């Protein structure tokens, strides 16, 4: 996500939390609590003691680790409890033990890789729970002879890009723009980035996986079966088990690529260009991806306008890009001076918002430093937004101010893959996907500010309803949004799940529920937007 720090205040990672830890209040609870911790060493590899990986609220580093990989500070305001423990797994058996013992002693398990869940479901719950933190399981094993790699769940997108670049300057992988995303969760919801039109989603290039099921078994593609392998690619893995690692197929990229950013304000014809972009961007050759990103700006007093950025990535050199743009989108007026040529791995820095010339070593920074209060929502568009609709969008942006919108074109490879190929169903027929995000600072207040900004995000979402997909109004699971429907922390009502399930997974929801019934019939793996087992008839 490329966000200007001049627009949104930066706040410290450390904040004062008004939530309390869940500690046993009677003897029965205390027995369960103690039994859980005594269970863990018995179920894990003794050569790598799990006791060294367990943090409780009594540990001095507990609060630091809890917050370190919790990237949306808003979620703490609504949290009623902290976890009874954090298991910072250092060996696959630690994750297996967490499943077996949490299940045996009736603790809910939340799985966290990078901590980028927009609603914080990977590290909050309203019932006694344990966080299984996968961050230390971050190995990346690349085999250039087969152009494949095994990537553990705790590795970040930045680490993956860096390790590929160590081996080759003509290989890459299609996944997120943000470089601190945990691979485990990012891939499980689909995983997309600026290679989406050329190579599809991350999951479209996954060829195997290791999954821990509700019985603590480690399964691969063959042993889990094709139905489960289908479900974990785009269906949100934490409904089905715990991803240990993904096996991916690397993709080919040229030695040099070209990136650009062209900005136009409303006074410079941005509305006409945005209208034209909708018609052009989804139909461009696969090698070219152009994101449209409008943001409100204030030139002083009441002199507000909207500046629209056209951010492009081309798998080729500048001369070829200019020839293509002169034919397909001459209205943008792209010039040679707008273009920057660089290696593919350097282009990942460009998209992440690092300054030109930054060392690729920044890709190894695994934790997002600047935390924010935020609320995000998503939409899919199957028809061009009329100019009147764009003007509505501009007006709401100027009214709200602290908000950003990203419009990402589809077409290309996404048109070619069936919506039944994986659990990810948003394929052909979509022109673009949109992220709406609003952010605010700690200085603006706590609960009251949160309520106000969340309501503003809903105002924008409602304003765009006439133009977005409908029946259902589709949403992207990696842009988690509890507004579209949810369950309680410890319950998964099927009728409630159908509401958000249809929006996230369209017609694939029922098949996902059927798979859930087979691999996790007692619904051990659950959260507020998980997939329930399909009821038996």
What is each residue range found by the language model?
Residues 2-537:
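Soluble FAD-dependent oxygen oxidases
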């Amino acid at each position: 996500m490329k966000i200007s720090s001049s627009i949104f205040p930066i706040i410290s990672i450390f904040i004062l939390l008004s939530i309390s830890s869940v500690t046993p209040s009677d003897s029965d609870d205390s027995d369960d609590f103690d039994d859980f911790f005594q269970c863990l060493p018995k179920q894990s590899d003794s050569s790598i003691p799990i006791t060294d990986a367990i943090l409780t609220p009594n540990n001095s580093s507990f609060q630091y680790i809890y917050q370190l990989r919790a990237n949306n500070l808003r979620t703490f305001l609504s949290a009623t409890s902290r976890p009874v423990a954090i298991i910072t797994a250092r060996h696959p058996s630690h994750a297996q033990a967490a499943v077996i013992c949490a299940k045996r002693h009736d603790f809910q398990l939340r799985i966290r890789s990078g901590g980028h869940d927009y609603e914080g479901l990977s590290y909050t719950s309203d019932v006694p729970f344990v966080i299984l933190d996968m961050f230390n399981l971050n190995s990346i094993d690349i085999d250039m002879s087969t152009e494949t790699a095994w990537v553990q769940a705790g590795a970040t997108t930045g680490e993956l890009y860096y390790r590929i670049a160590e081996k080759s300057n003509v290989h890459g992988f299609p996944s997120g723009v943000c470089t601190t995303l945990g691979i485990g969760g990012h891939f499980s919801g689909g995983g997309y980035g600026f290679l989406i039109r050329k190579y599809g989603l991350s999951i479209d290039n996954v060829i195997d996986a290791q999954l821990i099921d509700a019985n603590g078994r480690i399964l691969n593609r063959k042993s889990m079966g094709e139905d489960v392998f289908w479900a974990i690619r785009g269906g949100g893995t934490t409904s089905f088990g715990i991803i240990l690692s993904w096996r991916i197929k690397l993709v080919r990229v040229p030695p040099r690529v070209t990136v650009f950013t062209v900005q136009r304000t409303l006074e410079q014809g941005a509305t006409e260009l945005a209208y034209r972009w909708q018609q052009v961007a989804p139909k461009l050759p696969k090698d070219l991806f152009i994101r449209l990103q409008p943001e409100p700006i204030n030139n002083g007093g009441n002199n507000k306008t909207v500046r629209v950025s056209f951010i492009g990535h081309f798998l080729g050199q500048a001369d070829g890009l200019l020839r293509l743009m002169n034919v397909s989108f001459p209205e943008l007026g792209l010039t040679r001076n707008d273009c920057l040529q660089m290696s593919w791995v350097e282009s990942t820095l460009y998209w992440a918002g690092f300054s030109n010339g930054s060392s690729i070593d920044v890709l190894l920074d695994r934790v997002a430093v600047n935390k924010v209060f935020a609320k995000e929502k998503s939409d899919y568009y199957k028809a061009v937004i009329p100019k009147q609709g764009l003007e509505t969008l501009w007006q709401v942006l100027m009214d709200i101010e602290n908000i950003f919108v990203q419009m990402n074109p589809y077409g290309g490879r996404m048109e070619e893959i069936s919506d039944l190929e994986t659990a990810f169903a948003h394929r052909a027929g979509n022109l673009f996907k949109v992220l709406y995000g609003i952010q605010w600072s700690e200085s603006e207040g706590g609960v009251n500010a949160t309520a106000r900004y969340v309501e503003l995000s809903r105002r924008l979402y409602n304003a765009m309803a006439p133009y977005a997909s409908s029946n259902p109004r589709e949403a992207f699971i990696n842009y988690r949004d509890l507004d579209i429907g949810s369950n309680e922390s410890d319950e998964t009502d099927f009728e409630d799940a159908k509401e958000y399930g249809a929006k996230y997974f369209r017609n694939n929801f029922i098949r996902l529920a059927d798979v859930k019934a087979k691999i996790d019939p007692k619904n051990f793996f659950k959260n507020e937007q998980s997939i329930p087992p399909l009821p038996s008839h």
